[in-house]
Amino acid sequence: MPSEKATTRHLPGAVETLSPRTGRRPETPAYGSWLLGRVSESPRMRRVRIQGMLTVAILVTNVIGLIVGAMLLTVAFPKPSVILDAPHWVSFGIVPGYCVLAFILGTYWLTRQTARALRWAIEERTPSHDEARSAFLVPLRVALAVLFLWGAAAALWTIIYGLANRLFIPRFLFSMGVIGVVAATSCYLLTEFALRPMAAQALEVGATPRSLVRGIVGRTMLVWLLCSGVPNVGVALTAIFDDTFWELSNDQFMITVLILWAPLLIFGFILMWILAWLTATPVRVVREALNRVEQGDLSGDLVVFDGTELGELQRGFNRMVEGLRERERVRDLFGRHVGREVAAAAERERPKLGGEERHVAVVFVDIVGSTQLVTSRPAAEVVMLLNRFFTVIVDEVNHHRGLVNKFQGDASLAVFGAPNRLSHPEDAALATARAIADRLASEMPECQAGIGVAAGQVVAGNVGAHERFEYTVIGEPVNEAARLCELAKSYPSRLLASSQTLRGASENECARWSLGETVTLRGHDQPIRLASPVQQLQMPAQSADIVGGALGDHQTHTIYRGAHPTD
């Protein structure tokens, strides 16, 4: 049998799944059983499936009831005999005829009533509130119809057989009555199970479930009454009738009690199994959904198919997951606005104004000729170009564990070493700058950009007011990187770093850079030595106007490769 079929683990708590011993439990279907199909199943296939299940379940239940009734009437209570002491036209005419007629009319009537109550499902539309409430009454109507047919049989057969022998009266009333109640209850629970997909659709419109009993407690007490109360009443009535009418021998009385007890024990087990299964499957569905949430999967909601407190549990899970999804959307949006690292730091501890000194490396990137770019292209095209440009920057900065701290028009500022500490922020910044330069040259030749890299001590923290602040870094390396970026626009490599930055880098990274001119940047008092990727440093003639200081006779300098710089 497929791995989704369940059997009792312990009563009344939960139900164990029967499956091959593979070491793991199979995933529970959305409706709690593979018999009910998938949520994505076509409405027509679902109708055929449900109609077939209902027909088979009701017919089998009542056929078993007839077999048990025949055993009670012929073996448990042999005298008077329904075959020898009753008219043959009754035992071989009226009784079989009624059974066939009851099966035909009962099947027709139940099918018609069920189809009428579920017309909205047949028409493949959303039910109205009244239609949804009516759908919840289908199991009760099925149970009442089955109980009516058994009651009619008990009344008819009691009268007919009673006319032949009055001792038949208590026997038929007792046997047909007990079997009818148990069969009707079994049909109620089986119908409730089969209509889970329809109940799920009805619950979606907010209809209040209507049923024979309310809640888990009511359902449990009903099954207890049938599993425990009816057998005890049956044994008691057998003793009373034996003393009053039948005068059975001790052996016959024992056989009668055993025959009465055995079928009710089997029916009781089946009813309790159904009850435990109906109770356990929603819990199991929620449990497995919680496991998926624990693993980070927030993609799916549960199908609410139970009208008891278990349905409220399923709704509560869906509300919880929706809240988690909303939180993840806010977290993702927050991370996109301020950076993943800043967002993670804000979650770890309460944000506050102020900052702390950090040793960081800074990369500043700015497009060359941005004014001409904006005036020569449509605005939409400029936006698309900027998005491609910033995508390259963000990809490389994230790859090297940095933080894109700001987008300023067509420029961006990336920080390495804050808020997350890095053992070698200079290596990360220099590698990022080289990667950005290479990708821009190959992927976006129409968009050239200057890149400046600097490193040193900064203050990193939240700046602003208590109502509105942002995470940023303030210090000399930021200004230096911006000046180097402007200067780099006039160099073939479009990329410059300070010798101070190379001092903090590893030998492997330094081997990729060459030292060049010593210049004084605009707004700075002390000269710095420039560094550029190997074999790409070349000082342009107009650089004196850019750096804001005369280079005098020092237009050409020795280039040191593969070693740490010294001023």
UniProtKB/Swiss-Prot annotation:
Keyword Repressor recorded: no
Domain Guanylate cyclase: start-end pairs: 361-485
Membrane topology: Multi-pass membrane protein
Residues in HAMP domain copies: 277-329
Main location: membrane
Gene Ontology terms describing biological process: cAMP biosynthetic process; intracellular signal transduction
Annotated stretches, region: Disordered: 1-26
Protein name, UniProt field: Uncharacterized protein Mb1354c
Taxonomic lineage: Bacteria, Bacillati, Actinomycetota, Actinomycetes, Mycobacteriales
